[in-house]
């Protein structure tokens, strides 16, 4: 059920990669708990920074943390003060040397997590939920790499007594197609009526051959990339799309073309 499962987990190893990359034997549970604590630490107090995703990579004595953010200036701080504070807190949490990389997200309106966060902030500021959803969809569809988007809000929408879910969609969002590049984001809006969950799916086209073939094609020069050619099919004739030998007219034309020429035709 591609409509229910998390799109990232559904496509792991096919078109998406893990956001935590390390190997552990007996310390597996400890590392998972540590990763959750790192992500929670970076999420609290950094709402204005627009953090799209956090990637964690571990070696024997070092932890590398990549923060993808739409506003790197807020994460770095004045003269790097904020980045130094974050690094010291992470080193205190992990007990290892931390390499902190702050990467800028160029196209924030095409990132599902940032779109969901933007809609949630508008809901917290008492903006009508339908207006916030439509505005986010229009902004995302203006981006050249976005082929489709779906935005869903769940909770006491408009202060109603009974909670419900509503969604708007524009373009294609094939959630069950494994080769589809689906970006997914989730954020909660804190309102006076309670929490409202915002989910965003953004379709950015198909990745043919999976992430390994995509990486190989990007790395290879343009002349070395394999050409994709159309498969050969039998020629068709007639308005109904039938093959040349499946109708009486087609069979007659084929028989006439294959028959030997008569004496009169040769003399003419």
Curated annotation (Swiss-Prot):
Domain of life: Bacteria
Pfam families: KH_2, Ribosomal_S3_C
GO MF assignments: mRNA binding; rRNA binding; structural constituent of ribosome
Domain KH type-2: 38-106
Protein name: Small ribosomal subunit protein uS3
PROSITE patterns: KH_TYPE_2, RIBOSOMAL_S3
GO CC terms of this entry: cytosolic small ribosomal subunit
UniProt record, GO biological process: translation
Disordered as annotated region, ranges: 218-268
Primary gene name: rpsC
Organism listed in the record: Rhodococcus opacus (strain B4)
Family from the record: Belongs to the universal ribosomal protein uS3 family.
CDD domains in the record: KH-II_30S_S3 (cd02412)
UniProt lineage: Bacteria, Bacillati, Actinomycetota, Actinomycetes, Mycobacteriales
PANTHER family according to UniProt: 30S/40S RIBOSOMAL PROTEIN S3 (PTHR11760), SMALL RIBOSOMAL SUBUNIT PROTEIN US3C (PTHR11760:SF19)
Role played: Binds the lower part of the 30S subunit head. Binds mRNA in the 70S ribosome, positioning it for translation.
């Amino acid at each position: 059920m591609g409509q229910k499962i998390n799109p990232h987990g559904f496509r792991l190893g096919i078109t998406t990669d893990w956001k935590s990359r390390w190997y552990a034997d007996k310390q597996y549970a400890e590392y998972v708990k540590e990763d959750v604590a790192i992500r929670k630490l970076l999420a609290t107090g950094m709402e204005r920074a627009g953090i799209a995703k956090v990637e964690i990579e571990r070696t024997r004595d070092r932890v590398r943390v990549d923060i993808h953010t739409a506003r790197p200036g807020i994460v770095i701080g004045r003269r790097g003060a904020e980045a130094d504070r974050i690094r010291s807190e992470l080193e205190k949490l992990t007990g290892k040397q931390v390499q902190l990389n702050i990467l800028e997200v160029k196209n924030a309106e095409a990132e599902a997590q940032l779109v969901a966060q933007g809609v949630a902030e508008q809901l917290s500021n008492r903006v009508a939920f339908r207006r916030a959803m439509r505005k986010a969809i229009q902004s995302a569809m203006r981006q050249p790499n976005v082929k489709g988007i779906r935005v869903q809000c769940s909770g006491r929408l408009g202060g109603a007594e009974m909670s419900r879910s509503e969604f708007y969609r524009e373009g294609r969002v094939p959630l069950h197609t494994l080769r589809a590049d689906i970006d997914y984001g989730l954020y909660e809006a804190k309102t006076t009526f309670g929490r409202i969950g915002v989910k965003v799916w953004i379709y950015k086209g198909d990745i043919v051959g999976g992430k390994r073939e995509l990486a190989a094609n990007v790395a290879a020069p343009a002349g070395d990339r394999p050409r994709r050619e159309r498969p050969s099919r039998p020629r068709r004739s007639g308005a109904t799309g039938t093959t040349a030998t499946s109708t009486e007219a087609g069979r007659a034309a084929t028989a006439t073309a294959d028959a030997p020429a008569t004496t009169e035709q040769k003399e003419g």
